[in-house]
Design a protein with these regions (language model features):
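Bacterial N-terminal signal peptides
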Residues: 8-22
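Positively charged n-region of N-terminal signal peptides that target proteins for export
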Residues: 1-4
Length: 483
């Protein structure tokens, strides 16, 4: 008997210690999902240049604050981190600096961190002088951005709690229009290199023939909840460029923030003590905006259209969330590889032409309104390295695959990835882990148009083919990852 009593006491102590452990520790020990989410403010000081048009303007007003928004997931074996930043496009060196600090402070591997820009056109530039040249010499705003991205992920990681996750999609074609059109008038198809294209971006209302590409109406979303059903975060994805309707000197996160705020309202998440984080990422929208070129419709007040679009997408996602099936045990995986692409270079004839453009008097009538801008861009690419290494990344969340591509990706590329993916559900986040310009397909390069111009597009014309191949290769590796 005297030997049994200590054994019973030890068993009781063991049970007491076990059940006194924090919930997130118990969940981790059982291989259950944990999740945390956070935001950080990345609004720059006034006076910084807002990019989004051909002429950057200094900010003198803030309509709504800019944020980094993060979700961290942990299946007990693998951690994944998502970060979406309200910015037009962020260079790889900024993300790399943030990822290194995050790995050091949280243990989340660099390869398991997906960072992207929303592509709002009403934010201060985080770009470097030449996207094709890697640099570690960051400017003040880039360093600030690094610190706030790190803070955001650290807080999300600190907030890890037992969670369940599900995903779904809904169709919303009403806001999507391919912006590349075949048009009648040759004068409407001029390019800044003295030639004439087959298609034009953002044409006028007259002389329209047909759009040159498709749209992708699918709104994909991932919903993360606590085990008792409280909304932790939603990550959505929609292939719409940006909306705009913002004065040129005003800072705004565009419809991406409207989505986040309205979804929180619909979920009544603002009433919770623990903050909900809504995120809308940009899909493959390089050739899509929400201008109906055949029927322009009513004129909008400032900020009105982005409010309308953001609220619509949030409402559609919210209504679809009721059909989501949640799970608290599933496989997370990540695969990341560098892909070397050739940088496009001007030939001798083009170099001669752009030098002639720059030699002309500035008051001389140009062949194309933006020819001087593109002459300078061509010369910059001529002086750039021969190739560039870009990151291609894929995440797995159960039977969902997520691709991350560091370009403004044409919609048909995203549709091809969805069609060929080994996962039941798939979406792509563009402008992820870098920002290297537009990514047309080879067939669209043959048509010309703004997105294909040397200086708008900066890498080899076969780049999209190589990138899709790499994405699918990484998807297959992710899908084979063991539990």
């Amino acid at each position: 008997m005297k030997h049994i009593i200590p054994l019973v006491l030890w068993s009781l102590i063991h049970l007491f210690l076990l059940f006194s452990l924090p919930a997130h520790v118990l969940a981790q020990s059982k291989g259950k999902l944990q999740a945390g989410a956070a935001t950080s403010n990345i609004t720059p000081p006034l006076g910084e240049l807002i990019v989004g048009g051909f002429t950057p303007l200094p900010a003198d007003e803030v309509h709504d604050e800019l944020h980094a928004r993060s979700i961290v997931l942990d299946d007990g074996n693998t951690k994944l981190a998502f970060v979406l930043c309200d910015n037009v496009g962020i260079p790889r060196e900024v993300y790399d600096a943030a990822k290194k600090q995050i790995e050091e402070s949280t243990g989340i591997p660099i390869a398991n961190q997906l960072m992207a820009a929303t592509h709002t056109h009403s934010a201060t530039s985080a770009r470097s002088a030449n996207a094709m040249v890697h640099t570690t010499n960051l400017n003040d705003y880039q360093r600030f951005l690094v610190s706030r991205i790190v803070d955001c992920v650290r807080i999300a990681n600190k907030r890890l709690e037992p969670a369940k996750i599900g995903w779904g999609s809904v169709q919303e074609p009403s806001q999507l229009f391919n912006r590349r059109w075949y048009v009648v008038e040759e004068a409407d198809r001029r390019n800044p290199f003295g030639g004439v294209d087959q298609v034009r971006m953002n044409p006028g209302a007259s002389g329209l023939i047909r759009p040159a590409g498709p749209i992708d109406p699918q709104v994909s979303f991932v919903s993360v909840q606590s085990t008792d059903g409280r909304a932790i975060a939603v990550l959505a994805n929609y292939s719409l460029h940006y909306v705009g309707g913002v004065p040129g000197r005003t800072i705004s996160a565009d419809y991406f923030a409207v989505f986040a705020n309205h979804l929180a309202k619909l979920l009544e998440a603002n009433e919770s003590e623990k903050p909900f984080v809504g995120i809308l990422s940009n899909g493959t929208s390089g050739d899509v905006n929400n201008i109906n070129f055949q029927n322009r419709g009513k004129r909008y007040e400032l900020f009105q259209k982005m409010q309308e679009v953001g609220e619509l997408i949030a409402t559609r996602v919210h209504a679809s969330m009721k059909d989501v099936s949640y799970q608290d045990t599933l496989t997370l995986a990540a695969k990341t590889e560098e892909l070397t692409l050739k940088i496009r270079k001007p030939d001798t004839a083009l170099l001669a032409y752009v030098n002639q453009v720059l030699a002309k008097p500035k008051d001389e009538k140009p062949f194309h309104v933006h020819e001087r801008t593109y002459a300078e861009r061509v010369l910059q690419l001529a002086e750039s390295p021969e190739d560039v290494n870009v990151l291609i990344q894929t995440f797995r969340i159960g039977t969902l695959g997520i691709a991350a591509i560091p370009f403004e990706v044409f919609t048909e590329i995203g549709l091809e990835i969805k069609d060929k993916s080994p996962f039941k559900s798939t979406f792509t986040i563009e402008l992820a882990n870098g920002s290297y310009g537009y990514l047309p397909t080879p067939s669209h390069h043959a048509l010309g148009g703004y997105e294909t111009w040397l200086g708008t597009n900066k890498v080899e014309k076969e780049a999209s083919v190589k990138i899709v191949s790499k994405v699918l290769e990484l998807f297959h590796l992710c899908s084979a990852s063991p539990r």
